[in-house]
Design a protein with these regions (language model features):
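A substrate-binding/cap region within the structured catalytic cores of diverse enzymes
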Residues: 150-220
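C-terminal motif of bacterial Sec signal peptides marking the signal peptidase cleavage site
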Residues: 18-22
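Bacterial N-terminal signal peptides that target proteins for export
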Residues: 1-11
Length: 387
């Protein structure tokens, strides 16, 4: 009987211990499950809560714009000494490109007053740009009333003082242009050429992709720090090919050659935070043998999909020979916009604006496509602290 009671007691104790362990395990499992549920709940909240849109106010602004105002923002109009008040008021243009004649013989005060008058006529602040590359292309600095001497070419600047001189030059240009009221420099030149007979030879920094890339990176970063807009030009790179100002030009290099050489300075500029890319009028057979780059949808797909650039893409001047002389049935502004450009550089604003507006109103170009480009342009203006 004593043995039996002992065994019974042992069995009872074992069963009690098992029950208690089971309760403890259940309690621990409940805690783990509760923690998992809380984590899942937090994860669900994280996944479903979208970050705030930093440009929601720009979307709101676009929603209140008329179609005429939206179309106008897509145009970057050559000034060339003309009175721009009508273009600004009537066509709601997005920007004005100044040439040498717009600075020649003028004091800083006069240039400031001219640009201030343009801005006062604009409902939305204007991009005011000019080409101040240095060397053979200077618009403002060769006026002794504005600067003691014109800027040297970037390659000369480097030869005189190395990379620190290039950086100092970029800072100085930014301060100089901003002091005049200019907010965008149509630079840096990203083209690489080794042919001394090429029209780009004295404008390009180097025949070496790595050096040119470092130059572009330096200029973009310095300009960005000062809030001067930059434009990477002339995509996809002229190389040693002809001048599209006066004739058509064709590039027969392979896509791989372009990727491994000419694209590199553009990629450096994009990584540095460049605002815009200008597309040239050269025909690049390896991408699109039928159309100049500026009017080519495949070329613009390379910019967006291969280079991953989401800033403003602009045309080179649509008045240049290589596109102006084309035998096409559609207005250049419509063709260029359909190809993927956001900002259309031209002189004949009346006809090009009217053609693009008609294409939008007829449904040939969608409202969403217009809004997409207008948003890029307004974001650019916001980043330059003019909007």
């Amino acid at each position: 009987m004593k043995i039996k009671r002992t065994i019974t007691s042992l069995l009872t104790a074992a069963m009690l211990a098992t029950a208690l362990a089971g309760c403890q395990n259940t309690s621990e499992a409940s805690k783990v499950q509760s923690a998992n549920d809380e984590q899942n709940s937090q994860a669900t909240v994280t996944e479903t809560t979208a970050p705030p849109d930093p440009y929601s106010d720009i979307d709101d602004m676009i929603s209140k714009m008329t179609v005429e105002e939206k179309v106008g923002q897509l145009f970057y109009v050559n000034c060339r000494g003309n009175d721009m008040s009508d273009a600004i008021n009537k066509y709601h243009i997005g920007g004005v490109l100044l040439f040498g004649v717009d600075f020649d013989g003028k004091t800083k005060e006069k240039v400031n007053a001219d640009i201030k008058a343009m801005q006062s006529n604009a409902k939305i602040p204007l991009i005011i740009g000019t080409d101040e590359e240095g060397g053979t292309v200077v618009r403002a600095s060769d006026n002794p009333k504005l600067r003691e001497s014109a800027y040297l070419s970037p390659s000369e600047t480097f030869a005189n003082g190395g990379w620190s001189a290039v950086e100092d030059d970029a800072y100085d240009k930014a301060e100089f242009l901003l002091s005049l009221g200019v907010n965008v420099n149509m630079a840096p030149v990203c083209d690489i050429t080794s042919d001394s007979n090429s029209f780009m030879y004295y404008r390009s920094f180097s025949s070496d992709a790595a050096s040119t890339s470092r130059f572009v990176d330096t200029v973009v970063k310095a300009s960005k720090e000062k809030k001067l807009g930059t434009v990477l030009k002339h995509f996809p790179g002229y190389g040693d090919n002809g001048d599209t100002h006066y004739s058509d030009a064709t590039d027969s290099r392979t896509f791989s050659e372009l990727q491994n050489n000419d694209f590199l300075p553009f990629q450096a500029g994009i990584a540095a935070g460049a605002d815009s890319i200008l597309v040239s009028h050269i025909t690049v057979n390896s991408i699109d043998s039928e159309n100049p780059a500026s009017l080519s949808e495949p070329v613009h797909k390379v910019i967006r999909d291969t280079l991953k650039f989401d800033g403003v893409v602009m045309t080179d001047d649509l008045d240049m020979f290589a596109v102006d002389a084309l035998d096409i049935y559609e207005p250049l502004s419509v063709v260029a916009f359909k190809a993927g450009n956001d900002f259309l550089c031209c002189g004949d604003i009346e006809s090009e604006y009217t053609a693009l507006l008609n294409a939008v109103q007829s449904g040939e170009i969608t409202a969403d496509r217009i809004d997409e480009s207008v948003k890029r342009i307004l974001i650019w203006k916001r980043n330059l602290a003019i909007l």
